[in-house]
């Protein structure tokens, strides 16, 4: 394993990444937890945006934990919403793990790709070590591309809730090479809710570091 510890003012000089992939699908995960994902072609059919910046880390994928009692929220990964205490990320062949403890809430986020299927798994484990009851929520965010560049495809991406599975589906019928492909985002929890409205989540001029939702 390759282990990286980061904190406020203590980060890697440039993004360090782990590539997790099978022959048809993959994702690139950085030490900050930000990532982009593709299917079949890492350039022509990006599911989420790729930031070509050797210094600054950017992403269209994010997770958040929120204390519903206090309103305090943070990410189980160093970005986009860094918590107050250090993060430890462990990277191996086929997986990356992010460990963090914030205000008595310990979390582990495991990221890996199926050996054969075009599926990325993000497994979030949370333990309450604060010694008192805590009402918590977890939120995942994905910014669809379904093409090579988001500015070119954003007007053509359509999202919907699949009535059978309850998953969030996304498609881009204007991508001629992959028009029949459907991307999905799902959560293994019957109490889940979804929104396909980016502005509703981020707010006007909002950012992943401080979303409105």
Question: Where are the regions a protein language model picked out?
Answer:
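Anionic coordination/interaction segments
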Residues: 1-213
């Amino acid at each position: 394993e390759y282990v990286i510890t980061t904190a406020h003012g203590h980060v890697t000089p440039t993004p360090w990444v782990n590539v997790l992939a099978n022959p048809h699908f993959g994702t690139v995960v950085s030490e900050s937890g930000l990532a982009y994902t593709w299917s079949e072609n890492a350039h022509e059919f990006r599911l989420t945006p790729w930031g070509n910046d050797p210094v600054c880390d950017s992403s269209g994928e994010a997770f958040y934990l929120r204390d519903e009692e206090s309103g305090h929220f943070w990410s189980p990964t160093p970005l986009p919403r860094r918590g107050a205490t250090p993060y430890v990320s462990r990277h191996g062949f086929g997986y990356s793990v992010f460990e963090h403890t914030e205000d008595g809430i310990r979390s582990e986020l495991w990221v890996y790709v199926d050996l054969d299927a075009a599926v990325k798994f993000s497994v979030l484990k949370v333990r309450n070590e604060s010694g008192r009851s805590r009402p918590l929520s977890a939120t995942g965010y994905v910014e669809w591309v379904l093409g090579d560049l988001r500015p070119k495809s954003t007007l053509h991406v359509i999202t919907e809730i699949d009535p059978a599975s309850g998953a969030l589906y996304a498609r881009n019928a204007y991508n001629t090479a992959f028009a029949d492909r459907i991307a999905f985002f799902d959560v293994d929890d019957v109490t889940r809710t979804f929104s396909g409205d980016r502005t509703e989540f981020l707010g006007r001029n909002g950012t992943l570091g401080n979303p409105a939702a």
